[in-house]
Amino acid sequence: MIVDIYRSAKKEGMYLYVPRNKALDELPEPLMKQFGRADHSMVLVLTPEKKLARASVEKVIESIENQGFYLQMPPPPESYMNEIPNDKMPR
């Protein structure tokens, strides 16, 4: 499966995978409103053997086949506050 990957101009770390032959205006309006301006990032060939950095390729392919897209959300922010010792809190 050949996909176009778009980077969200609205939210860093958010990416949208769509089949190569699908136009962005065919995607649901609420999705595109949440995603914001889509900046083309790359074209990728997805195969079951392919490794992706933050998603299972099987999950991505399944989502594209069922919904027509895969939305990769940004990773959760690291909670540096958990690392700060607090002598008033039991451990």
UniProtKB/Swiss-Prot annotation:
YcgL domain ranges (all copies): 1-85
SUPFAM superfamilies: YcgL-like
InterPro entries: YcgL-like_sf, YcgL_dom
Span list, region Disordered: 72-91
Name of the protein in its database record: YcgL domain-containing protein Sde_1339
